[in-house]
Protein backbone atom coordinates (compact mmCIF):
# COMPACT_ATOMS: atom_id res chain seq x y z
CA UNK A 1 0.00 0.00 0.00
CA UNK A 2 1.20 3.50 -0.81
CA UNK A 3 1.60 6.17 1.81
CA UNK A 4 0.69 8.92 -0.64
CA UNK A 5 -0.61 8.96 -4.20
CA UNK A 6 0.05 12.19 -6.10
CA UNK A 7 -2.44 13.05 -8.84
CA UNK A 8 -0.80 15.12 -11.57
CA UNK A 9 2.75 15.44 -12.92
CA UNK A 10 2.84 19.15 -13.65
CA UNK A 11 5.34 21.46 -11.93
CA UNK A 12 3.49 21.12 -8.60
CA UNK A 13 3.08 17.34 -8.80
CA UNK A 14 6.68 16.77 -9.87
CA UNK A 15 7.95 18.82 -6.97
CA UNK A 16 5.63 16.96 -4.59
CA UNK A 17 7.06 13.68 -5.91
CA UNK A 18 10.61 14.91 -5.29
CA UNK A 19 9.70 15.95 -1.73
CA UNK A 20 7.96 12.63 -1.06
CA UNK A 21 11.10 10.83 -2.20
CA UNK A 22 13.24 13.12 -0.08
CA UNK A 23 11.25 12.06 2.98
CA UNK A 24 11.36 8.36 2.08
CA UNK A 25 7.61 8.13 1.63
CA UNK A 26 6.20 5.19 -0.30
CA UNK A 27 4.59 7.14 -3.12
CA UNK A 28 3.57 7.14 -6.77
CA UNK A 29 2.25 9.65 -9.29
CA UNK A 30 -0.52 9.28 -11.86
CA UNK A 31 -0.71 11.62 -14.85
CA UNK A 32 -3.61 11.70 -17.31
CA UNK A 33 -1.47 12.72 -20.30
CA UNK A 34 1.43 10.97 -21.98
CA UNK A 35 4.20 13.20 -20.62
CA UNK A 36 5.00 15.37 -17.58
CA UNK A 37 4.62 19.12 -17.32
CA UNK A 38 0.88 19.74 -17.27
CA UNK A 39 -0.15 23.04 -18.85
CA UNK A 40 3.49 24.03 -19.39
CA UNK A 41 4.01 21.07 -21.71
CA UNK A 42 0.55 21.15 -23.29
CA UNK A 43 0.43 24.84 -24.10
CA UNK A 44 3.70 26.67 -23.49
CA UNK A 45 6.46 24.15 -24.23
CA UNK A 46 8.71 26.48 -26.25
CA UNK A 47 7.74 29.72 -24.51
CA UNK A 48 9.87 31.49 -21.96
CA UNK A 49 8.85 31.75 -18.31
CA UNK A 50 10.11 34.83 -16.48
CA UNK A 51 8.80 34.41 -12.93
CA UNK A 52 10.65 31.30 -11.71
CA UNK A 53 12.97 32.19 -8.80
CA UNK A 54 16.61 31.91 -9.84
CA UNK A 55 15.93 31.93 -13.59
CA UNK A 56 15.87 35.29 -15.42
CA UNK A 57 14.12 33.32 -18.16
CA UNK A 58 13.76 29.65 -19.03
CA UNK A 59 11.64 27.77 -21.55
CA UNK A 60 8.82 25.67 -20.15
CA UNK A 61 10.40 22.56 -21.69
CA UNK A 62 13.78 23.20 -20.10
CA UNK A 63 12.19 23.89 -16.73
CA UNK A 64 10.14 20.68 -16.79
CA UNK A 65 13.18 18.72 -18.01
CA UNK A 66 15.05 20.04 -14.97
CA UNK A 67 12.22 19.03 -12.65
CA UNK A 68 12.13 15.53 -14.12
CA UNK A 69 15.90 15.25 -13.63
CA UNK A 70 15.46 16.35 -10.01
CA UNK A 71 12.71 13.75 -9.46
CA UNK A 72 14.64 10.93 -11.16
CA UNK A 73 16.85 10.53 -8.07
CA UNK A 74 13.87 8.64 -6.62
CA UNK A 75 12.20 7.19 -9.74
CA UNK A 76 13.12 3.55 -9.02
CA UNK A 77 11.01 3.64 -5.85
CA UNK A 78 8.53 6.33 -6.88
CA UNK A 79 7.01 5.63 -10.31
CA UNK A 80 5.02 7.99 -12.51
CA UNK A 81 2.19 6.23 -14.35
CA UNK A 82 1.29 8.12 -17.54
CA UNK A 83 -2.06 8.00 -19.37
CA UNK A 84 -3.74 7.24 -16.05
CA UNK A 85 -6.68 9.43 -15.07
CA UNK A 86 -8.10 9.39 -11.54
CA UNK A 87 -11.66 8.21 -12.06
CA UNK A 88 -12.81 7.46 -8.51
CA UNK A 89 -11.55 7.98 -4.95
CA UNK A 90 -13.26 6.04 -2.18
CA UNK A 91 -12.52 5.81 1.53
CA UNK A 92 -12.07 2.24 2.75
CA UNK A 93 -11.36 1.69 6.46
CA UNK A 94 -8.15 3.64 7.18
CA UNK A 95 -7.10 4.25 3.58
CA UNK A 96 -8.33 5.17 0.10
CA UNK A 97 -8.96 3.09 -2.99
CA UNK A 98 -8.23 5.11 -6.12
CA UNK A 99 -9.53 3.79 -9.42
CA UNK A 100 -7.61 5.00 -12.47
CA UNK A 101 -7.83 4.29 -16.20
CA UNK A 102 -6.21 0.85 -15.84
CA UNK A 103 -5.32 0.46 -12.17
CA UNK A 104 -6.73 0.17 -8.66
CA UNK A 105 -4.38 1.79 -6.16
CA UNK A 106 -4.58 1.64 -2.36
CA UNK A 107 -3.05 4.56 -0.49
CA UNK A 108 -3.18 6.12 2.97
CA UNK A 109 -3.16 9.70 1.66
CA UNK A 110 -3.94 11.45 -1.62
CA UNK A 111 -2.37 14.68 -2.86
CA UNK A 112 -4.25 16.28 -5.76
CA UNK A 113 -1.97 18.43 -7.92
CA UNK A 114 -3.86 18.29 -11.19
CA UNK A 115 -3.95 22.03 -11.90
CA UNK A 116 -7.74 22.03 -11.97
CA UNK A 117 -8.03 19.35 -14.64
CA UNK A 118 -6.81 18.51 -18.12
CA UNK A 119 -6.60 21.11 -20.88
CA UNK A 120 -8.41 20.48 -24.16
CA UNK A 121 -7.96 22.89 -27.09
CA UNK A 122 -11.01 24.47 -28.67
CA UNK A 123 -11.03 22.98 -32.15
CA UNK A 124 -11.56 24.49 -35.57
CA UNK A 125 -15.08 23.50 -36.62
CA UNK A 126 -14.43 21.32 -39.64
CA UNK A 127 -15.50 17.77 -40.42
CA UNK A 128 -12.18 16.29 -41.56
CA UNK A 129 -8.91 15.77 -39.70
CA UNK A 130 -5.85 17.33 -41.31
CA UNK A 131 -2.29 16.66 -40.18
CA UNK A 132 -1.12 20.24 -40.73
CA UNK A 133 -3.83 21.84 -38.57
CA UNK A 134 -2.07 22.10 -35.22
CA UNK A 135 -3.25 22.93 -31.70
CA UNK A 136 0.14 22.47 -30.05
CA UNK A 137 3.64 23.35 -31.18
CA UNK A 138 6.42 20.99 -30.14
CA UNK A 139 9.27 22.04 -32.42
CA UNK A 140 9.48 25.48 -34.00
CA UNK A 141 12.12 24.27 -36.46
CA UNK A 142 9.49 22.39 -38.47
CA UNK A 143 8.09 25.75 -39.60
CA UNK A 144 11.30 27.07 -41.13
CA UNK A 145 10.55 28.93 -44.41
CA UNK A 146 6.94 27.65 -44.47
CA UNK A 147 3.68 29.54 -45.02
CA UNK A 148 2.01 29.73 -41.62
CA UNK A 149 -1.48 30.89 -40.67
CA UNK A 150 -2.21 31.49 -36.98
CA UNK A 151 -5.87 31.64 -35.93
CA UNK A 152 -6.81 33.55 -32.76
CA UNK A 153 -6.64 36.91 -31.07
CA UNK A 154 -5.43 36.24 -27.53
CA UNK A 155 -2.01 36.55 -25.96
CA UNK A 156 -1.00 32.99 -26.83
CA UNK A 157 -1.95 33.42 -30.49
CA UNK A 158 0.13 36.60 -30.73
CA UNK A 159 3.02 34.98 -28.87
CA UNK A 160 3.05 32.06 -31.31
CA UNK A 161 2.81 34.38 -34.31
CA UNK A 162 5.77 36.41 -33.04
CA UNK A 163 7.83 33.29 -32.27
CA UNK A 164 7.03 31.74 -35.67
CA UNK A 165 8.09 34.91 -37.47
CA UNK A 166 11.64 34.16 -36.31
CA UNK A 167 11.58 30.98 -38.43
CA UNK A 168 9.73 32.16 -41.53
CA UNK A 169 8.88 35.45 -43.20
CA UNK A 170 5.39 34.24 -44.18
CA UNK A 171 3.19 34.34 -41.08
CA UNK A 172 -0.42 35.54 -41.26
CA UNK A 173 -2.58 36.08 -38.18
CA UNK A 174 -6.35 35.77 -38.69
CA UNK A 175 -8.77 37.06 -36.05
CA UNK A 176 -12.55 37.26 -36.17
CA UNK A 177 -12.69 40.72 -34.59
CA UNK A 178 -10.95 44.03 -35.22
CA UNK A 179 -10.09 44.27 -31.52
CA UNK A 180 -7.65 41.88 -29.87
CA UNK A 181 -7.70 40.39 -26.39
CA UNK A 182 -3.91 40.28 -26.58
CA UNK A 183 -1.69 43.12 -25.41
CA UNK A 184 -1.59 45.96 -27.93
CA UNK A 185 2.20 45.94 -27.69
CA UNK A 186 2.20 42.32 -28.94
CA UNK A 187 -0.13 43.22 -31.81
CA UNK A 188 2.10 46.14 -32.81
CA UNK A 189 5.21 43.97 -32.53
CA UNK A 190 3.82 41.27 -34.81
CA UNK A 191 2.46 43.79 -37.31
CA UNK A 192 6.07 44.72 -38.06
CA UNK A 193 6.93 41.07 -38.80
CA UNK A 194 3.86 39.54 -40.45
CA UNK A 195 0.36 40.08 -41.82
CA UNK A 196 -2.83 40.60 -39.80
CA UNK A 197 -6.26 39.90 -41.31
CA UNK A 198 -9.36 41.10 -39.42
CA UNK A 199 -12.25 40.59 -39.02
CA UNK A 200 -12.21 37.21 -40.77
CA UNK A 201 -13.50 33.77 -39.86
CA UNK A 202 -12.66 30.41 -41.42
CA UNK A 203 -15.46 29.46 -43.81
CA UNK A 204 -14.07 26.26 -45.32
CA UNK A 205 -10.77 24.50 -45.91
CA UNK A 206 -9.47 22.89 -49.08
CA UNK A 207 -7.05 20.03 -49.00
CA UNK A 208 -6.21 16.44 -49.86
CA UNK A 209 -4.20 13.54 -48.46
CA UNK A 210 -4.87 14.80 -44.92
CA UNK A 211 -3.20 18.15 -45.64
CA UNK A 212 -4.88 21.54 -45.97
CA UNK A 213 -3.47 23.72 -48.74
CA UNK A 214 -5.99 26.60 -48.71
CA UNK A 215 -8.10 28.34 -46.08
CA UNK A 216 -11.24 30.04 -47.38
CA UNK A 217 -11.87 33.04 -45.13
CA UNK A 218 -15.07 35.07 -44.87
CA UNK A 219 -15.13 38.72 -43.82
CA UNK A 220 -17.28 38.98 -40.68
CA UNK A 221 -19.01 42.16 -41.91
CA UNK A 222 -19.04 42.19 -45.72
CA UNK A 223 -19.03 38.37 -46.16
CA UNK A 224 -16.38 38.81 -48.84
CA UNK A 225 -14.34 35.62 -49.30
CA UNK A 226 -10.58 35.38 -49.40
CA UNK A 227 -8.39 32.38 -50.24
CA UNK A 228 -5.24 31.97 -48.16
CA UNK A 229 -2.60 29.34 -48.97
CA UNK A 230 -0.81 27.68 -46.06
CA UNK A 231 1.63 24.91 -45.23
CA UNK A 232 0.55 24.88 -41.57
CA UNK A 233 -2.43 26.26 -39.66
CA UNK A 234 -1.86 26.90 -35.96
CA UNK A 235 -5.16 27.20 -34.09
CA UNK A 236 -5.19 29.07 -30.80
CA UNK A 237 -8.82 29.58 -29.84
CA UNK A 238 -8.06 28.89 -26.19
CA UNK A 239 -8.44 25.85 -23.98
CA UNK A 240 -11.22 24.41 -21.88
CA UNK A 241 -10.77 22.38 -18.72
CA UNK A 242 -12.08 18.84 -18.68
CA UNK A 243 -14.97 18.26 -16.30
CA UNK A 244 -13.97 18.17 -12.64
CA UNK A 245 -14.82 15.07 -10.59
CA UNK A 246 -14.75 16.92 -7.25
CA UNK A 247 -18.47 16.46 -6.63
CA UNK A 248 -18.25 12.75 -7.40
CA UNK A 249 -15.36 12.41 -4.95
CA UNK A 250 -17.17 14.38 -2.24
CA UNK A 251 -14.51 17.10 -2.06
CA UNK A 252 -15.73 20.59 -1.27
CA UNK A 253 -14.93 23.15 -3.93
CA UNK A 254 -16.23 26.13 -5.82
CA UNK A 255 -16.10 26.79 -9.56
CA UNK A 256 -13.93 23.73 -10.03
CA UNK A 257 -11.37 24.79 -7.41
CA UNK A 258 -10.67 22.74 -4.28
CA UNK A 259 -10.99 24.50 -0.93
CA UNK A 260 -8.07 23.82 1.41
CA UNK A 261 -6.96 24.91 4.88
CA UNK A 262 -3.51 26.14 5.91
CA UNK A 263 -2.14 22.57 5.91
CA UNK A 264 -3.45 22.07 2.33
CA UNK A 265 -6.05 19.59 3.62
CA UNK A 266 -9.30 19.43 1.69
CA UNK A 267 -12.74 18.92 3.22
CA UNK A 268 -11.97 15.19 3.40
CA UNK A 269 -9.47 13.95 5.98
CA UNK A 270 -6.55 12.27 4.23
CA UNK A 271 -6.92 14.14 0.94
CA UNK A 272 -4.67 17.14 0.32
CA UNK A 273 -4.32 19.46 -2.66
CA UNK A 274 -1.87 22.00 -4.08
CA UNK A 275 -1.32 24.12 -7.19
CA UNK A 276 -3.62 25.95 -9.57
CA UNK A 277 -6.55 23.66 -8.80
CA UNK A 278 -7.01 24.96 -5.24
CA UNK A 279 -8.36 28.08 -3.60
CA UNK A 280 -7.99 29.83 -0.26
CA UNK A 281 -7.98 33.49 0.83
CA UNK A 282 -5.03 35.23 -0.80
CA UNK A 283 -4.26 32.41 -3.24
CA UNK A 284 -1.86 33.46 -6.03
CA UNK A 285 -1.56 31.26 -9.12
CA UNK A 286 2.16 30.96 -9.71
CA UNK A 287 4.40 27.94 -10.25
CA UNK A 288 6.43 28.91 -7.19
CA UNK A 289 3.40 29.22 -4.90
CA UNK A 290 2.05 25.86 -6.08
CA UNK A 291 5.35 24.25 -5.21
CA UNK A 292 5.31 25.88 -1.78
CA UNK A 293 1.84 24.42 -1.27
CA UNK A 294 3.19 21.01 -2.30
CA UNK A 295 5.90 21.33 0.38
CA UNK A 296 3.27 22.18 2.99
CA UNK A 297 1.08 19.25 1.94
CA UNK A 298 3.93 16.70 1.96
CA UNK A 299 5.09 17.93 5.37
CA UNK A 300 1.51 17.69 6.72
CA UNK A 301 1.18 14.14 5.39
CA UNK A 302 4.61 13.11 6.72
CA UNK A 303 3.73 14.41 10.20
CA UNK A 304 0.50 12.38 10.24
CA UNK A 305 2.23 9.25 8.96
CA UNK A 306 5.09 9.51 11.46
CA UNK A 307 3.87 11.53 14.46
CA UNK A 308 6.71 10.19 16.59
CA UNK A 309 9.20 12.07 14.42
CA UNK A 310 10.03 15.71 14.89
CA UNK A 311 7.71 18.21 13.21
CA UNK A 312 10.75 20.21 12.18
CA UNK A 313 11.08 20.59 8.42
CA UNK A 314 14.43 19.19 7.29
CA UNK A 315 16.23 20.82 4.39
CA UNK A 316 17.57 18.91 1.39
CA UNK A 317 21.19 19.56 2.40
CA UNK A 318 20.58 17.43 5.49
CA UNK A 319 18.60 14.74 3.68
CA UNK A 320 20.70 14.15 0.55
CA UNK A 321 24.16 12.68 0.85
CA UNK A 322 26.07 12.59 -2.45
UniProtKB/Swiss-Prot annotation:
<feature type="binding site">
    <location>
        <position position="86"/>
    </location>
    <ligand>
        <name>FAD</name>
    </ligand>
</feature>
<feature type="binding site">
    <location>
        <position position="119"/>
    </location>
    <ligand>
        <name>FAD</name>
    </ligand>
</feature>
<comment type="subunit">
    <text>Homodimer.</text>
</comment>
<keyword id="KW-0274">FAD</keyword>
<feature type="binding site">
    <location>
        <position position="12"/>
    </location>
    <ligand>
        <name>FAD</name>
    </ligand>
</feature>
<feature type="binding site">
    <location>
        <position position="39"/>
    </location>
    <ligand>
        <name>FAD</name>
    </ligand>
</feature>
<dbReference type="GO" id="GO:0004324">
    <property type="term" value="F:ferredoxin-NADP+ reductase activity"/>
</dbReference>
<keyword id="KW-0285">Flavoprotein</keyword>
<feature type="binding site">
    <location>
        <position position="317"/>
    </location>
    <ligand>
        <name>FAD</name>
    </ligand>
</feature>
<feature type="binding site">
    <location>
        <position position="31"/>
    </location>
    <ligand>
        <name>FAD</name>
    </ligand>
</feature>
<feature type="binding site">
    <location>
        <position position="44"/>
    </location>
    <ligand>
        <name>FAD</name>
    </ligand>
</feature>
<dbReference type="GO" id="GO:0050661">
    <property type="term" value="F:NADP binding"/>
</dbReference>
<comment type="similarity">
    <text>Belongs to the ferredoxin--NADP reductase type 2 family.</text>
</comment>
<dbReference type="InterPro" id="IPR050097">
    <property type="entry name" value="Ferredoxin-NADP_redctase_2"/>
</dbReference>
<keyword id="KW-0560">Oxidoreductase</keyword>
<dbReference type="GO" id="GO:0050660">
    <property type="term" value="F:flavin adenine dinucleotide binding"/>
</dbReference>
<dbReference type="Pfam" id="PF07992">
    <property type="entry name" value="Pyr_redox_2"/>
</dbReference>
<protein>
    <recommendedName>
        <fullName>Ferredoxin--NADP reductase</fullName>
        <ecNumber>1.18.1.2</ecNumber>
    </recommendedName>
</protein>
<dbReference type="InterPro" id="IPR036188">
    <property type="entry name" value="FAD/NAD-bd_sf"/>
</dbReference>
<keyword id="KW-0521">NADP</keyword>
<dbReference type="InterPro" id="IPR023753">
    <property type="entry name" value="FAD/NAD-binding_dom"/>
</dbReference>
<dbReference type="InterPro" id="IPR022890">
    <property type="entry name" value="Fd--NADP_Rdtase_type_2"/>
</dbReference>
Amino acid sequence: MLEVLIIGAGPTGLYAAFLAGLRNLKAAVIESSAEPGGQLTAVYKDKYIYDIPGFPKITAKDYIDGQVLQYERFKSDLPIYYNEEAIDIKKHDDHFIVTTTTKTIETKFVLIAHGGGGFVPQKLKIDEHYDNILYFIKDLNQFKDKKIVVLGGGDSALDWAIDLSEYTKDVTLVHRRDEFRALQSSVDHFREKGTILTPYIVDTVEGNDKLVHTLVLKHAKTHERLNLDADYIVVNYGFVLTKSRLDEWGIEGEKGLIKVDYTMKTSLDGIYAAGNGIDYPGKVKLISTGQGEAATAIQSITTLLYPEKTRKFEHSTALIKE
